[in-house]
Amino acid sequence: MLHEAAPDNTCYVWSLGDKAATDAAFAKAAHVTRLEFINNRLIPNAIEPRAAIGLYSRAEDAYTLDVSNQNPHVERLLMAAFVLGLPEHKLRVVAPDVGGGFGSKIYLYAEDVVVTWASKQINRPVKWTAERSESFVSDAHGRDHHTI
């Protein structure tokens, strides 16, 4: 255990509905079947790795991020509002040919923030491309659902 607040590798437990009403419905049922579903974890390692190019325009005091992301609108919202502290119109996020992703390219990653931030610091475009092997340890893994 690394931290008391996170004693295991469970990301979250998602409870939904009215437990008392559900228990009552099962108690009245003529037949009840119990199943346990396990959807194994996978590593969505696409042939095309994650990549990002950050560009800062001093003339416009605005950023452009070209990124292999499956959800550029949310990436812009999260990065502008919660990371860089910018109004959204000061950050343009472009997602051209994303390639494969299988869900792993839907998140905001630190590398996207760093290339964007660094482009202003050095007043030049900054490009970063992952190696496929690092995707195994750096990209978000998929699934690993356990439903009872």
Task: Describe each model-derived feature in a short phrase.
Residues 1-148:
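Structural alpha/beta core scaffold segments of enzyme domains
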